[in-house]
């Protein structure tokens, strides 16, 4: 549930009682009624490997889900008597296939760039979804001379020793004086709800 709430692309391999005993109510150790349904309610996608031959397809699908759309955990349930099964050939590529990203609205990008270029006191806020873009964010921060505020999931995107990396107490102070907020792969929900906004502040949400 934590991975789901934090948009973390986690692959969870879940143990299960022997395949033939699932749903029989034998009272086996670790037996949970309809465990797969519970798993589906906590993940972006969940499936069960019921034989060695289906492992390739199910795992490939799981990795595809991890790499596409909104980051969320994916679950794969494996009964205990399937773990040691062997298959002649594992045909699929677990890395998956490239996924097309969202359509880019160039007009909105140009508008955002114009706002940032004319800003006097810009601030960048980063979330966990921006972890793979550390180099780009550091370059952007330097070019704008914009301090970077990171909540827990965004820690480390900008090195803590950098002059442009600020702590939350300092970030709260800067928030009250900035004219533009560039929020990268974060809803910026906590800052807006607890630190407040005003009519003079422009917030650009990306991702």
Q: Where are the predicted features?
A:
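N-terminal alpha/beta PP-like core and its mobile active-site loop of ThDP/TPP-dependent enzymes
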Residues: 1-207
């Amino acid at each position: 549930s934590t991975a789901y709430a934090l948009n973390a692309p986690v692959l969870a391999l879940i143990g299960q009682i022997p395949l033939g005993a699932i749903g029989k109510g034998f009272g086996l150790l670790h037996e949970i009624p309809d465990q797969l349904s519970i798993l589906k309610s906590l993940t972006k996608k969940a499936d069960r490997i019921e034989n060695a031959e289906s492992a390739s397809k199910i795992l490939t699908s799981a990795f595809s889900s991890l790499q596409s759309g909104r980051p969320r955990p994916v679950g794969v349930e494996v009964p205990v008597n399937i773990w040691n099964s062997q298959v002649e050939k594992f045909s699929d590529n677990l890395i998956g296939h490239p996924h097309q990203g969202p359509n880019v609205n160039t007009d909105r990008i140009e508008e955002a760039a114009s706002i940032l270029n004319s800003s006097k006191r810009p601030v960048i806020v980063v979330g966990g979804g921006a972890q793979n873009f550390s180099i780009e964010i550091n370059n952007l921060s330097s070019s704008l001379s914009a301090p970077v505020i990171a909540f827990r999931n965004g820690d480390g995107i900008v090195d803590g020793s950098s002059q442009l990396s600020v702590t939350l107490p300092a970030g709260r102070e800067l928030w009250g004086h900035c004219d533009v907020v560039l929020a990268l792969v974060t809803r910026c929900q906590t800052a807006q709800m607890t630190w407040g906004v005003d009519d003079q502040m422009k917030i650009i949400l990306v991702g």
